[in-house]
Structures are given as C-alpha cells and as structure tokens.
Amino acid sequence: VNPEELKRLVAQAACDEVLKLPPGQCLGIGTGSTANWFIDLLAPHQGHFAGVVSSSVASTQRLIQQGFYVLDTNQVTDLPVYVDGADEINPQGHMIKGGGGALTREKIIAAMAKRFICICDASKQVAVLGHFPLPLEIIPLAEPYIMRTITALGGEGRLRMVGVTGQPFITDNGGWILDVHGLSITQPVQLEAQINQIPGVVSVGLFAQRKADLLLVGGPTGVVAVAHSQ
C-alpha cells in the first residue's frame, strides 16, 4: 500500500471517530499531509460541527477553501477532540511534532482538547524518539544561548533555513525553528520539561506531558487503533 493511501485510510478512520461526537461541537485540526487528507474527507460532514480551530495558516486556508467555519482559539472554551499527525510516536504515545513548523499552535490546541487523536502511518512508530530532529520554536535573539544549552544537553541544534535564500524559516508567530539532531529521547516527559525551562524557547516539539489518547495507525493490514491513558 502506498504512503498516500495509508494516509487516506487513517484520515477516514479519524473522520468516522469524530462523527461519533454529538452535533454542534467544535473540533481541533492540525497541520501536515495526513491532516490535509482528514480535512478533505471531513468536508462533506462539516455541518455536523459548530466550527473548527486550526493549528496553522496553511490548514486554515485549506479549511476555508473546503467551506469550514474556522474559529479563533480565543473564541472556543470547549474542545472535545484534536486530530493531528506526528513525525514520530513511541509505544507510550509520546510524540515528536513540528516538522512543518506549527508546533506552538499545535501544542496550544492539544492542551485545550479533551482528547488527542493522532493519525499517522506505521513508518512514524519508533521504539525511542529522537531519530527525527526535535524542533524548538525560539525567540530569535535567544538563538546563540539556546544553541549552547542544547549542545550541553548532548544535542546538535541547526537553525531551520528557507530554500536557497539562506534566511531563517519564520513561524506563524514570528519565531525561528531550531531542529535538534542526535538526541536519544529515553525520558521524553523530563526532557520536555527541561527544554521548556530554557529562556527564549517558545515551545518544544515533544508532546509527552500531553500525549496522544488514541493513535490511528495505517499499515499493511489496514488501520490499527491504539488507546493510551494519560
């Protein structure tokens, strides 16, 4: 089964899951290629929901094109479910996210939501997190200090650049992204707390304190659902 077909299958499974919600509620939607499948497949059922909150400008544009009513996070007090992908996920449901650069907004919406449904294909499942570079959103003026601190933690920080321009990648919030290579993250909850304490770090792409409640993973045999308790 090709990767796109796996993404479509898990996105369809997530649609089936969220349509179990009573009508008239809000839904959180993430960012990335699998989330895009989810948006497109859910579009015919948008009337079931009062509105959606989105983790990025890119997802918001796609949602509006598909006719969804997109709400600002400040307008929403009750968010039953957030659906998003992951760059890596371990057997405990801890994730690395933020490969697309939207980690801060993803983290805010994940914290607001009662349930986090992670959708991905089996290639994202790992025993230990860290092979995928861990993204940090940072305040630009803190970059040299954060870089030194990350080196002391045993990681190699690389500032994310845009194409051939040699300019730093700018997030939707005006921050920079530091991708940390070379970490073997055996203690994700502790590392998340440790990195969050570094002055100038806006957020870290470790979703361990708030992990996935339900993983829908696409593999050769179809979609497998794995529940995790917080």
Q: What is each stretch, according to the model?
A:
Residues 1-26, 31-78, 210:
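Active-site catalytic microenvironments in core metabolic enzymes, especially phosphate/sugar-handling
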Residues 2-9, 57-230:
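Conserved phosphate- and dinucleotide-binding cores of soluble alpha/beta proteins
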